[in-house]
């Protein structure tokens, strides 16, 4: 079957005298039948080219699914007199959310059976479940399109009936005031930016709602939450480099909101309330890796803030949790998370002990102050996800749950370690790898290298059931902790954004070279994968070093950087000027143009490539991957596979059911196995 060829229609994109010719610009017309026809033709071609893997895809799907415990439930947590539990039943794609009053022996109360709610929808997402103070009402958000636009409904938990209230065009989240009849929520504008906080009174039409706050700066997003103490409702507004918060008492929802500290560029802070103070995690006073401060509720401006935990250049504070007797810090040191426990009198100061060399740990859900029990999450590439309750007073721990892996899984069959590759500028970059203990490394060993490297998002190690299907077929799996993430602290992020963005791509390529030079694999057997901004990474490394990879999987890739960042009518653009740069300024325009994958396709050989996207994707518009594939097909000089798979129903996150998404994984793995000559 011949590959589809998209029609060329020349579009001149002119910016300050610079002319770019985009022959596939027309693909951004979602309503044009010719666009739909082209996407369908690409899907048909992908299906045809992958036809010889259909049995393998089915096998992989069932292999992965058979390891997942179908009737599974979360560890209960207690909040405001009720225990909350989510569970899955055999055959169910979606969770069932339940609760029990006071103790776990009480009768179960089903709040939401999402399997029932999702009937008749190809995509369904329930989000932002929020229970009123009197425990009688639940507000929740629903998205049935995967555009991340939610309608909020309210359910009476006594009768099981939905109230008539219907709040459209929201983020899905909401906050109840103490009166059980006032609800605060966030609305989105046409670019899907969260820009307004509204106040809704129960039983009234949305047209009667009151606008409480509007964020007029389009580089900021706004949100609303309630403090852990449940005493204050807080409106936050954040950009990439600054924050601003305002608050009002939860039992006085009609009072004006008072600002905590007006926004200043490069002043970042977040807040929590305890006792008579707000506790503030901030980079104030050049605290690059953040410090913890506090200020009285009556005097919140920054000149009143005092240090609780001073800044330490080598330790990055990511999160904190307050208890009556203890302060808990989630920190990052030398690329690994650690949990520091201190009591308020200063006599106790210790770290939770973790046995593995490479792991990921984080503070879990801890809604109560008056307890000595800290709940954390723990995982590694060989240890399934675990929920642990740690007694901070007696230093004892109880594993409440370790994710069950069915079949003959034995974690002792696998090994994980961290290695350090030296980048071209001399910086050492950590890489986490996992493999079967009986695997021998060499030039014929297949290796899948994964990366992201943007927004300060950490690619921490985690356990994955699907990944076992790679490892058990002789693969090494590597996570590249490249610059642009925050694994080694805030400077690691700063060194991989704006005019340092190319460090992200260079790190990934240099890690690939390191893995080849040190005989973990060879270019014939090296594969790369990344999604969204990690898809940009895939496009950039493919342009820079196509000879290093046998195959690449680019999931919902952000590949037309310049055109997207010049279009402030589409989601995320203006809010991301502090991540990529503002292309209306020549220095940033030129720099982005020099690495944007779509603008740098050349007549040369490229690796085998599978590209995935969703027609309704709001984060990376479908036309970016579509245009990229069309242009690659026209210019590339090789006979390698080039496949585009568009999910015509889903958005950025792919399919919504827990098993449906495994079919996407099965396709991606089958693509790699096909290239590797693995048939089962």
Predicted regions and their residues:
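Active-site-proximal cap/loop segments of hydrolase catalytic domains
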Residues: 479-680
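Beta-propeller folds
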Residues: 1-373, 377-385, 389-393, 410, ...
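Active-site lining segments that contact anionic ligands and/or coordinate catalytic metals
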Residues: 221, 230, 242, 266-268, ...
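Short beta-turn/strand-loop junction motif enriched in small, turn-promoting residues
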Residues: 83, 88, 116, 143, ...
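Cap/lid segment of the alpha/beta-hydrolase catalytic domain
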Residues: 115-129, 140-147, 161, 390-396, ...
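Short hydrophobic segments within beta-strands
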Residues: 86, 281, 330, 377, ...
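Extracellular/periplasmic catalytic domains that process cell-envelope and extracellular macromolecules
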Residues: 18-19, 103-104, 470-471, 602-605, ...
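Glycine-rich His-Gly loop
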Residues: 88, 283, 379, 450-454, ...
């Amino acid at each position: 079957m011949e590959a589809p060829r998209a029609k060329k229609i020349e579009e001149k994109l002119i910016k300050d005298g610079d002319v770019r010719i985009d022959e596939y610009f027309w693909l951004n017309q979602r309503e044009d039948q010719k666009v739909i026809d082209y996407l369908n033709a690409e899907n048909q071609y992908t299906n045809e080219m992958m036809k010889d893997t259909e049995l393998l895809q089915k096998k992989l799907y069932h292999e992965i699914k058979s390891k997942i415990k179908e009737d599974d439930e979360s560890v209960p947590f207690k909040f405001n007199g009720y225990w909350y539990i989510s569970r899955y039943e055999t055959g169910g794609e979606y969770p069932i959310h339940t609760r029990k009053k006071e103790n776990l022996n009480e009768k179960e109360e089903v709040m939401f059976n999402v399997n029932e709610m999702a009937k008749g929808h190809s995509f369904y997402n329930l989000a932002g479940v929020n229970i009123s103070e009197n425990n009688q009402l639940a507000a929740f958000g629903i998205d049935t399109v995967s555009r991340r636009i939610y309608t909020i409904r309210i359910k009476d938990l006594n009768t099981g009936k939905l109230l008539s209230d219907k709040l459209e065009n929201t983020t899905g989240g909401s906050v109840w005031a103490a009166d059980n009849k006032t609800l605060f929520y966030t609305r989105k504008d046409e670019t899907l930016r969260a820009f307004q906080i509204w106040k809704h009174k129960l039983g009234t039409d949305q047209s009667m709602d009151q606008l409480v706050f509007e964020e007029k700066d389009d580089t900021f997003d706004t949100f609303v939450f309630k403090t852990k103490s449940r005493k204050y409702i807080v409106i936050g507004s954040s950009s990439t480099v600054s924050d601003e918060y305002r608050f009002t008492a939860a039992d006085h929802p009609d009072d004006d909101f008072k600002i905590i500290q007006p926004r200043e560029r490069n002043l970042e802070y977040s807040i929590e309330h305890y006792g008579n103070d707000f506790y503030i995690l901030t980079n104030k006073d050049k605290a690059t890796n953040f410090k913890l401060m506090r200020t009285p509720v009556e005097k919140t401006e920054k000149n009143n803030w005092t240090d609780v935990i001073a800044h330490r250049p080598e330790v990055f504070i990511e999160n904190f949790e307050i208890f009556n007797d203890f302060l808990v810090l989630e920190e990052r040191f030398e690329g690994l998370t650690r949990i520091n426990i201190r009591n308020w009198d200063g006599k106790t100061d210790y770290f939770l002990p973790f046995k593995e060399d490479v792991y990921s740990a984080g503070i879990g859900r801890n809604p109560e102050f008056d307890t000595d029990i800290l709940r954390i999450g723990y995982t590694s590439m060989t240890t399934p996800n675990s929920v642990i309750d740690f007694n901070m007073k007696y230093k004892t721990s109880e594993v409440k749950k370790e994710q069950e892996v069915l079949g003959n899984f034995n974690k002792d069959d696998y090994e994980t370690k961290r290695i350090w590759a030296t980048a071209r500028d001399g910086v050492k970059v950590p890489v986490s790898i996992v493999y079967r203990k009986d695997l021998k490394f060499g030039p014929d060993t297949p290796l899948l290298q994964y990366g992201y490297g943007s927004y300060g998002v950490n690619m921490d190690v985690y356990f994955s059931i699907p990944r076992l299907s790679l490892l058990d077929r002789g693969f090494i799996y590597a996570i590249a902790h490249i610059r642009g993430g925050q694994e080694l602290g805030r400077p690691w992020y700063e060194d991989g954004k704006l005019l340092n963005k190319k460090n992200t791509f260079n790190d990934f390529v240099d890690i690939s070279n390191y893995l080849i030079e040190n005989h973990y694999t060879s270019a014939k057997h090296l594969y790369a994968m990344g999604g969204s901004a990690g898809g940009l990474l895939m496009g950039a490394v493919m342009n820079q070093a196509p000879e290093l990879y046998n195959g690449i999987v680019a999931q919902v890739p952000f590949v037309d950087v310049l055109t997207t960042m010049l279009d402030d009518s589409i989601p995320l653009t203006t809010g991301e000027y502090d991540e990529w740069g503002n292309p209306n300024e020549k220095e940033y325009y030129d720099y982005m143009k020099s690495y944007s994958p779509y603008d740098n396709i050349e007549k040369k050989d490229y690796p085998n490539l599978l590209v995935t996207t969703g027609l309704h994707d709001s984060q990376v518009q479908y036309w970016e991957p579509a245009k990229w594939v069309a242009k690659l097909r026209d210019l590339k000089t090789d006979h390698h596979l080039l496949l585009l798979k568009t999910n015509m129903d889903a958005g950025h996150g792919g399919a919504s059911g827990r098993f449906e998404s495994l079919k996407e994984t099965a396709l991606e793995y089958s693509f790699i196995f096909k290239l590797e000559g693995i048939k089962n």
